[in-house]
UniProtKB/Swiss-Prot annotation:
Species: Prosthecochloris aestuarii (strain DSM 271 / SK 413)
Taxonomic placement: Bacteria, Pseudomonadati, Chlorobiota, Chlorobiia, Chlorobiales
Keywords for this protein: ATP-binding, Isoprene biosynthesis, Kinase, Nucleotide-binding, Transferase
Name the UniProt record assigns to this protein: 4-diphosphocytidyl-2-C-methyl-D-erythritol kinase
GO molecular function: 4-(cytidine 5'-diphospho)-2-C-methyl-D-erythritol kinase activity; ATP binding
Main function: Catalyzes the phosphorylation of the position 2 hydroxy group of 4-diphosphocytidyl-2C-methyl-D-erythritol.
Transmembrane region(s): none
Length: 286
């Protein structure tokens, strides 16, 4: 069998509201995922064992890596004895809140389900994905905007794309999601806005006023401890973004722009200071 190569795209969060904490310690949330044009490249080759290599030497390639965990979880589910050599060309910054590791894991499930002739159902793959992480189901099942709730297991593809251009900045800090959940300023007693309805107004009527309720609950604690992240958000606004926010638990931030030309110009200017990536309006994962 020949090798298979794929791209694994990153995401941003339009709003990230932490709604509670379960008895098992997991936090529940509501968010809207949107894809961006920042991707890793993965190559899957037949092998006797499950193993991995990566262009970024700071990333482990052992059982703690989500790709390895995804491959072994699928193998355990199916009972196959096949192996795979995974080659990861890492471009999405890690510890940035862009879901790079989750996207890589979703690509691993999708490719190996075919390569190993498992033909697991979408329901079975969803269960495996939920066990790997809150963002993994999104990358497995959606190409555009999607609403997620619970611990990520409640996922609804909104069948929409964002009609605005995006500039994403990585300030350089690597922020642990575990740290962010331990330290964010909890406020569970509040009314949660209808993110699904509001994002439809945003996309279908270009009603940008709805964005005022698209808060990210990690922003206050991240900005307090990582001032460079706040500065990056401010830089986006100064460059013409009409809405800017932290993505996930950071440290990446993103800004929305009215058109591609303004966004491209801002990305080029900001690339002198940050790792910057432009995403055109109405982008969807291939």
């Amino acid at each position: 069998m020949q090798s298979i190569s794929v791209k694994a795209y990153a995401k941003i969060n339009l709003g990230l509201l932490i709604t509670g904490k379960r008895p098992d310690g997991y936090h529940t949330l509501e968010t809207v995922f949107a894809p961006i044009n920042w991707y890793d490249e993965l190559t899957f080759s037949p092998s006797q064992e499950v193993r991995m290599s990566c262009t970024n030497q700071d990333l482990p390639c052992d059982d703690s890596n989500l790709c390895i965990r995804a491959a072994k979880a699928l193998r355990d589910f199916s009972g196959v004895s096949s192996g795979v050599e995974i080659g990861l060309a890492k471009h999405i910054p890690f510890g940035a809140g862009l879901g790079g590791g989750s996207s890589d894991a979703a690509s691993t499930l999708r490719v190996l389900n075919r390569m190993w002739n498992i033909n697991a159902s979408s329901h079975d793959l969803h269960r495996i994905a939920v066990g790997l992480g809150a963002d993994v189901p999104y990358f497995l099942e959606s190409g555009g905007l999607a609403y997620a709730a619970g611990i990520g297991e409640e996922l609804e593809d909104l069948e929409l794309t964002l009609p605005f251009s995006i500039v994403t900045l990585f300030p350089g800090d690597h922020i642990s999601t575990v740290w962010a959940y331990r330290n964010f300023y909890a406020c569970f007693e509040r009314e949660i806005p209808d993110l699904k309805g509001l994002v439809r107004s945003l996309c279908q009527a270009r009603d940008t006023s709805v964005l005022e309720v698209f808060d990210n609950d990690f922003e206050p604690v991240v900005f307090d401890h990582y001032p460079a992240v706040r500065e990056a958000k401010d830089a986006l606004v100064q460059s013409g973004s009409f809405f800017a926010s932290l993505s996930g638990s950071g440290s990446a931030v993103f800004g929305l722009f009215e058109n591609d030309s303004d966004a491209e110009r801002a990305a080029e200017q900001l690339s002198a200071t940050y790792r910057a990536r432009f995403t055109p309006a109405s982008f969807a994962m291939a």
